[in-house]
Amino acid sequence: MARIAGVDIPRNKKIEIAITYIYGIGRSNGMDVLRKANVDPNRRVRDLTEEEVGRIREIIDREYRVEGDLRREVQLNIKRLMDIGCYRGLRHRRGMPVRGQRTRTNARTRRGRRGQAIGIKKKVKK
């Protein structure tokens, strides 16, 4: 396995897909990196030379914020929203949808599991 930005890249996948295993690199950013590094996107990771892997690693380190740094930045942005007390920060603090979705129904992912259903119990016969 090639190791780029602290992530083990799967050997059997094409490099254009495998590079997206890095947090912060999607399909379009991955293609940009490969274009700058002069690497064919259709080649498998196992077929890359050490020099090509080094070029990819260097471009990502130089031009992109990935993995731990990016996660930390996102967390700090959310914390800043909560500290200043804006609407988005309050929604984050309460664990509710932030981007205007409805909450009367269909907010289960953000709000967590539903409470116990309250219904009518059958009477036990004696």
From Swiss-Prot:
Residue ranges, annotated region (Disordered): 95-126
Superkingdom assignment: Bacteria
Signal peptide limits: none
MF term (GO), any: structural constituent of ribosome
GO biological process, one term: translation
A Pfam family reported for this protein in Swiss-Prot or TrEMBL: Ribosomal_S13
Gene Ontology, cellular component aspect: cytosol; small ribosomal subunit
Keywords: Ribonucleoprotein, Ribosomal protein, RNA-binding, rRNA-binding, tRNA-binding
Protein task: Located at the top of the head of the 30S subunit, it contacts several helices of the 16S rRNA. In the 70S ribosome it contacts the 23S rRNA (bridge B1a) and protein L5 of the 50S subunit (bridge B1b), connecting the 2 subunits; these bridges are implicated in subunit movement. Contacts the tRNAs in the A and P-sites.
Subunit description: Part of the 30S ribosomal subunit. Forms a loose heterodimer with protein S19. Forms two bridges to the 50S subunit in the 70S ribosome.
Record-linked PANTHER family: 30S RIBOSOMAL PROTEIN S13/40S RIBOSOMAL PROTEIN S18, SMALL RIBOSOMAL SUBUNIT PROTEIN US13M
NCBIfam families in the cross-refs: uS13_bact
Sequence similarity: Belongs to the universal ribosomal protein uS13 family.
Name of the protein: Small ribosomal subunit protein uS13
Species this chain originates from: Chloroflexus aggregans (strain MD-66 / DSM 9485)
Gene: rpsM
